[in-house]
């Protein structure tokens, strides 16, 4: 099973970043470089170290830094596959996505995958100041339009894509980079709900399963929706990639495990409070917990939220294991359905811990 992990730029755990920003803005700290530690030199070092540790891919998420730039550095100094997981698509034009995908495919010599997602309405409207409507239909057109643009560049001929939301019918030599010597990169979608997942299986090259998930959710909700989409499009499973993003709590010592579990509990509490993920919480019998977390979030009681994530909830939505057992635990859940897994460790962790976690995958 292929295994990738997050390419970090600066302080990546939510709790630590929130505390660091609060200290900076309150005047209790005066050096963002020390508090948040953004460094592109770190990206280069990580890429080399993670490849040596046994990972075959790294991914970025669209959060506090650009989602594409770190991958250009990682690809240029390693043989790792690189992917966005995910780039937020709705605020962007398909032409923007196509250019970024083309260039990263070129820089990586054919090792890039474009992962895109819709995000949720408040983020699109209030953070990106972009319109939100018909997310499933828009994402379908974004995939088809991006593929049409890349195909136009690859094979020549006119660009002819006309949809309800996007229209691309003009491409002159000044805008076209020409054929990519490494071919057209795959386009994957991060999806959660049944309509988005079914659409993904109809038109995209693969599905990025949301990290806030569970084995039951994947088997009872995700896979049937994938099968429905593949069937509607007349596609077979071999033409489609399923990537499981898995939240992992791991550590070689009890102290490391305590740090890991604290970070995972904070992340699960954040996800669990969000109305978007209510169907998942309901499926796992956690509706009351979801409602409580949502109330705490609205009251600004963020420090209290993680205390509501007990061991049972943690082990439902994340994998908790010592490094040498991580691969075995993930394989038991998703080994028969996932083409790749991406490990998500939402807490401070050195490359040596990542290497220890990757060992089991290399052995398998």
Identify the role of each PLM range.
Residues 3-7, 32-34, 57-60, 82-85, ...:
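Hydrophobic faces of well-ordered beta-strands that scaffold small-molecule active sites
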Residues 70-87, 91, 142, 358-364:
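Alpha-helix-loop-beta-strand connector modules within alpha/beta enzyme cores
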Residues 1-83, 185:
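N-terminal beta1-alpha1-beta2 module of alpha/beta enzyme domains
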Residues 94-103, 251-262:
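Catalytic cores of alpha/beta
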Residues 256-313:
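Active-site pocket-lining/capping segments in soluble small-molecule metabolic enzymes
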Residues 37-49, 100, 191-199, 264, ...:
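Short, acidic/polar
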Residues 13-18, 27-31, 100-101, 106-112, ...:
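Internal, glycine-rich beta/alpha segment that forms the wall or movable "lid"
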Residues 54, 74, 104, 146, ...:
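Conserved, mostly hydrophobic/aromatic
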């Amino acid at each position: 099973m292929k295994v990738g992990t997050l390419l970090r730029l600066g302080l990546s755990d939510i709790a630590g970043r929130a505390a660091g920003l609060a200290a900076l803005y309150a005047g209790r700290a005066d050096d963002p470089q020390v508090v948040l530690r953004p460094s592109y030199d770190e990206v280069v070092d990580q890429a080399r170290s993670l490849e040596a540790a046994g990972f075959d891919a790294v991914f970025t998420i669209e959060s506090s830094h650009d989602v594409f730039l770190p991958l250009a550095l990682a690809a240029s100094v390693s043989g790792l596959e690189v992917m966005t997981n995910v780039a937020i698509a709705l605020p962007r034009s398909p032409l923007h996505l196509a250019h970024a995908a083309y260039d990263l495919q070129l820089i990586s010599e054919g090792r890039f995958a474009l992962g895109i997602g819709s995000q949720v309405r408040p983020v699109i409207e209030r953070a990106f100041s972009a319109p939100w409507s018909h997310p499933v239909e828009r994402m379908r057109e974004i995939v088809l339009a991006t593929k049409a643009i890349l195909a136009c560049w690859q094979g020549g001929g006119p660009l002819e894509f006309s949809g309800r939301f996007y229209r691309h019918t003009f491409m002159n030599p000044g805008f076209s980079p020409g054929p990519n010597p490494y071919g057209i990169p795959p386009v994957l979608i991060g999806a959660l709900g049944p309509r988005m997942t079914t659409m993904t299986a109809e038109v995209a090259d693969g599905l990025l399963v949301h990290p806030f998930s569970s084995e039951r959710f994947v088997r009872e909700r995700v896979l049937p929706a994938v099968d429905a989409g593949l069937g509607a499009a007349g596609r077979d499973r071999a033409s489609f990639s399923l990537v499981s993003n898995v939240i992992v709590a791991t550590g070689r010592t009890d102290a490391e495990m305590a740090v890991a579990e604290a970070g995972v509990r904070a992340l699960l509490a954040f996800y669990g409070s969000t109305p978007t993920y209510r169907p998942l919480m309901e499926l796992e019998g956690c509706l009351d917990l979801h409602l409580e977390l949502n109330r705490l979030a609205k009251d600004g009681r963020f420090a209290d939220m993680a205390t509501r994530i007990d061991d049972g909830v943690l082990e439902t939505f994340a994998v908790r294991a010592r490094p040498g057992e991580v691969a075995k635990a993930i394989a038991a859940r998703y080994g028969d359905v996932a083409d790749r897994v991406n490990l998500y460790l939402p807490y401070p962790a050195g490359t040596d811990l990542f290497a220890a976690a990757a060992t089991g995958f290399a052995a398998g």
